[in-house]
Amino acid sequence: MKKLILTFIILSSITTTTTPIENPYTIRIFTKEDAKPFLPFVAQLRINIFREYPYLYEGNLKEEMDDLEHCAQLTDNALAIAFHENTPVGFLYGIPLVEFSSHFENPVLDLFKEKELIPEACYYFADIIIVPEHRGNNLSKKLFNALETYAQERGYHSASFITESHESHPLKPLNYKQLEPLWYSLQYKKTGLTSYGSWQTHQPDGSVIRQRHSADIWFKYLTK
């Protein structure tokens, strides 16, 4: 069963690189076999965090691992992990848009071409999640910077991701903080394009049903 990987794997034959941020945080990029030991961390964090608004996603660990292990073998995929000392506390993973497009339920590649955007030159950021206790340490920007550089070094000229937000939803927390200011600060803009995907979704009455969702597509050109 195909499912949409939510915003925010891994990867060519490169080993790992390390980029210090500020003590005690470090960003490391993993590819292919080097990424595999961290896939359970990624899968479980996705299940835990994406259960919350706005995704309300009911995850399955086996399905998560199957999808991550498949994506880990694709060309130019990369998993960037933020470490607090030696403990992983967040991640961002990227994949060429053309490799990821089968996860969408609508023809996103065709939509890009209609906008005169080149999907073959676009690197897609699938998920970014920071453990709640470690948010506010500039880790999101550092993770994006690391994988944007990785993508540019492999010839990609643009980057993209998707976001979902129900403006009025009974499960939306009163203190929910929109992330649009972060995306704009990273120089991404909404394209006006929409992607669609379906997943098991928590309902206000406590039930879980498979539901179709729409998401905004963001984009930017990568520059040195």
Where are these regions (language model features)?
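Glycine-rich phosphate/pyrophosphate-binding loop shared by adenosine-nucleotide-utilizing enzymes
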Residues: 25, 87-91, 123
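Conserved acyl-donor/pantetheine-binding loop and adjacent beta-alpha core of acyl/acetyltransferases
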Residues: 93-127, 196-209
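Conserved catalytic-core motifs of GNAT/GCN5-like acyltransferases
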Residues: 162-163, 171-204
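Conserved GNAT acetyl-CoA-binding A-motif
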Residues: 122-125, 151-175
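Conserved N-terminal entry element of GNAT/NAT acetyltransferase domains
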Residues: 8-9, 18-37, 44, 48, ...
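Active-site rim helix/loop that mediates acceptor-substrate recognition in acyltransferases
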Residues: 56-84, 93-96
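Conserved acetyl-CoA-binding loop-helix of GNAT-fold acetyltransferases
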Residues: 130, 136-152
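Helix-loop element at the rim of GNAT/NAT acetyltransferase active sites that forms part
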Residues: 43-59
